[in-house]
């Protein structure tokens, strides 16, 4: 295939594949895309460049009866990922809907590896026989190269519906989310200095997580000094009911001082006098003499 670099020299023209007929299949079937020629890829590789897809257009043109039903699912996969994580974007649209699918890549790939992108289709819930040549697909790719990768602003996939009897309510498309990242701190012997005031400086034998206050919980080997500096750390993990100390001592004392029992001075004196007499009586009574036989 003839393919040339365009001006500026780091961008390729749109590379079009042949508009070929494809057989109806319920299983994922590859759509052949045309990529830059081996010579063009070798030129970019010799310049130590990496490559990305700027824009990919997949043209779908149906050739089925008007009473045909079913849905077509088109998927773009990145084969650098494991099989269950390779899906990058997907579209679902009616079998009889002529449509253009648009995809914009968000990553570079090395020219030392095989081109990783693969395009697949399958048909579901249809009344058309399998292996019927139900449609034609055509792919158009625009790629570019760079000396090194840079962050690429995300552009969502989209569609252009060409059949008037269908609207955007009849199609759906999606894109994979960003991969999750969880920092895993490097454990080191100097973690006893975590939390000390002052500018953070990484020293030999230390990691950023161990020096910063945003690191995760410390290991079992941390020093006693660290425990003394952070006596009450991780208390936020307890529930509010556990951390609530209850009413203060002043409130408790005030509540105890408040009573519904009232006594006059005379009644209080009588109570004290009676109590004292009972105590004297119980302590001063002589014991009964024992009889010896």
From Swiss-Prot:
Q: State the InterPro entries in the record.
A: Gemini_BL
Keywords linked to the UniProt accession:
DNA-binding, Host cell membrane, Host endoplasmic reticulum, Host membrane, Host microsome, Membrane, Phosphoprotein, Transport, Viral movement protein
Its subcellular locations are: Host cell membrane; Host microsome membrane; Host endoplasmic reticulum membrane
**Which GO MF terms are attached to this record?**
DNA binding
Instruction: Tell me if Ligase is a UniProt keyword of this record.
Output: no
**Quick check: keyword Phosphoprotein in the entry?**
yes
After translation, how is this protein modified?
A: Phosphorylated.
Q: Which GO terms describe its biological process?
A: transport of virus in host, cell to cell
* Family the entry assigns: Belongs to the begomovirus movement protein BC1 family.
Q: Describe the task this protein carries out.
A: Transports viral genome to neighboring plant cells directly through plasmosdesmata, without any budding. The movement protein allows efficient cell to cell propagation, by bypassing the host cell wall barrier. Begomovirus genome is shuttled out of nucleus by Nuclear shuttle protein (NSP) and the movement protein transports the DNA-NSP complex to cell plasmodesmata and facilitates further movement across the cell wall.
Protein's name according to its UniProt entry: Movement protein BC1
Q: Which organism is it from?
A: Potato yellow mosaic virus (isolate Venezuela) (PYMV)
């Amino acid at each position: 295939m003839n393919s040339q670099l365009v001006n500026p020299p780091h961008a390729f023209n749109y590379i079009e594949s042949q508009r070929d007929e494809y057989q109806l299949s319920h299983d994922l079937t590859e759509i052949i895309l045309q990529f830059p020629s081996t010579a063009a890829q070798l030129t970019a590789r010799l310049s130590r460049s990496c490559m990305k897809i700027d824009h990919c257009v997949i043209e779908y043109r149906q050739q089925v009866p008007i009473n045909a039903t079913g849905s077509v699912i088109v998927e773009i996969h990145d084969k650098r990922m494991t099989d269950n994580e390779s899906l990058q974007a997907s579209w679902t649209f009616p079998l009889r809907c002529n449509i253009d699918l648009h995809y914009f890549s968000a990553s570079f790939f090395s020219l030392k590896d095989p081109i990783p992108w693969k395009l697949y289709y399958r048909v579901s819930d249809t009344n058309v026989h399998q292996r019927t040549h139900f449609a034609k697909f055509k792919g158009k790719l625009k790629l570019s190269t760079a000396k090194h990768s840079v962050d690429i602003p995300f552009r969502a996939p989209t569609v252009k519906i060409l059949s008037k009897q269908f609207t955007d309510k009849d199609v759906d498309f999606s894109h994979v989310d960003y991969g999750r990242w969880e920092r895993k701190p490097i454990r080191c012997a100097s973690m006893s200095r975590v939390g000390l005031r002052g500018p953070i400086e990484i020293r030999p034998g230390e990691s950023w997580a161990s020096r910063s206050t945003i690191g995760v919980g410390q290991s079992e080997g941390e020093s006693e000094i660290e425990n003394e500096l952070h006596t009450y750390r991780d208390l936020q993990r307890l529930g509010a009911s556990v951390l609530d100390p209850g009413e203060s001592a002043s409130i408790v004392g005030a509540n105890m001082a408040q009573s519904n029992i009232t006594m006059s001075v005379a009644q209080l004196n009588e109570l004290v006098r009676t109590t004292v007499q009972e105590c004297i009586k119980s302590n001063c009574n002589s014991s009964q003499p024992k009889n010896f036989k």
